[in-house]
Amino acid sequence: MNFGLFFLNFQLKGMTSEAVLDNMIDTIALVDKDEYHFKTAFVNEHHFSKNGIVGAPMTAASFLLGLTERLHIGSLNQVITTHHPVRIAEEASLLDQMSDGRFILGLSDCVSDFEMDFFKRQRDSQQQQFEACYEILNDGITTNYCYANNDFYNFPKISINPHCISKENLKQYILATSMGVVEWAAKKGLPLTYRWSDTLAEKENYYQRYLTVAAENNVDITHVDHQFPLLVNINPDRDIAKQEMRDYIRGYIAEAYPNTDQEEKIEELIKQHAVGTEDEYYESSKYALEKTGSKNVLLSFESMKNKAAVIDLINMVNEKIKKNL
């Protein structure tokens, strides 16, 4: 099992954007030190509200790569359906070369109808647009060239500069946003990053479908390493841990799930993430990782208000990782 971090960068009431971003920067600078055994860090993409204030995760990743020496850093969910695939290929290739292969490209379909409309994309062909975008940018990364002649893009063969030095070895992950995306990823043998806001049952359904489709298409998934994002808030007082998590995710849940029982959704997520006392999270987290075939666990400590306690918890997790190396 490999461990990394992910950052949602929610700006809660009373917080400044500087404080939110500084928290991410300081945490990554801490775990980049040689004595830490976290391997990766990922930045979430979100638009138009404070429920995630980074709209350009690859830009944030470029700063963090320049700040660090050891960690592999990338986008958690760079949305490709609403961005031009050539620009993504160019940026990914540049970051790959400048970071000496430490950049990770996490990709996603769009999960917001408003964003699809805002960026003038057609909802009824969303899956096809996602797939077309991926083929273009992946060609650019792996062959240094790409062209398009489809329903969405039409341009002659062009060169991607600078060339991506990692090419097919540039690590890619696909956010599990729908069953269609999961089935497509399985056919290509691309690893998934599960959504933190999906229930465990939804994640498990995606994993089982991934296994089925991969088998039907004779795809070898021996080395596929799915990623499980885990929200963490550990406190000697479980009530404090749970309330801090409620306060942290409530705004996003209200925005992303307007037609559900939001309080019920929040309580369900609290049960399925690492929230409570030190003795309460291990078995449930281990069970979730097994049920989703996850080989990587990504941790977010952002809901914890006591930053000294966050450092202590990171150090505790690091010692446990070290003992199991």
From Swiss-Prot:
<keyword id="KW-0599">Photoprotein</keyword>
<keyword id="KW-0288">FMN</keyword>
<protein>
    <recommendedName>
        <fullName>Alkanal monooxygenase beta chain</fullName>
        <ecNumber>1.14.14.3</ecNumber>
    </recommendedName>
</protein>
<keyword id="KW-0560">Oxidoreductase</keyword>
<dbReference type="InterPro" id="IPR036661">
    <property type="entry name" value="Luciferase-like_sf"/>
</dbReference>
<comment type="similarity">
    <text>Belongs to the bacterial luciferase oxidoreductase family.</text>
</comment>
<keyword id="KW-0503">Monooxygenase</keyword>
<dbReference type="GO" id="GO:0008218">
    <property type="term" value="P:bioluminescence"/>
</dbReference>
<dbReference type="Pfam" id="PF00296">
    <property type="entry name" value="Bac_luciferase"/>
</dbReference>
<keyword id="KW-0285">Flavoprotein</keyword>
<dbReference type="InterPro" id="IPR018235">
    <property type="entry name" value="Bacterial_luciferase_CS"/>
</dbReference>
<dbReference type="GO" id="GO:0005829">
    <property type="term" value="C:cytosol"/>
</dbReference>
<dbReference type="InterPro" id="IPR050766">
    <property type="entry name" value="Bact_Lucif_Oxidored"/>
</dbReference>
<comment type="function">
    <text>Light-emitting reaction in luminous bacteria. The specific role of the beta subunit is unknown, but it is absolutely required for bioluminescence activity.</text>
</comment>
<dbReference type="InterPro" id="IPR033924">
    <property type="entry name" value="Alkanal_monooxygenase"/>
</dbReference>
<keyword id="KW-0455">Luminescence</keyword>
<dbReference type="InterPro" id="IPR011251">
    <property type="entry name" value="Luciferase-like_dom"/>
</dbReference>
<dbReference type="InterPro" id="IPR002103">
    <property type="entry name" value="Luciferase_bac/NFP"/>
</dbReference>
<comment type="subunit">
    <text>Heterodimer of an alpha and a beta chain.</text>
</comment>
<dbReference type="GO" id="GO:0047646">
    <property type="term" value="F:alkanal monooxygenase (FMN-linked) activity"/>
</dbReference>
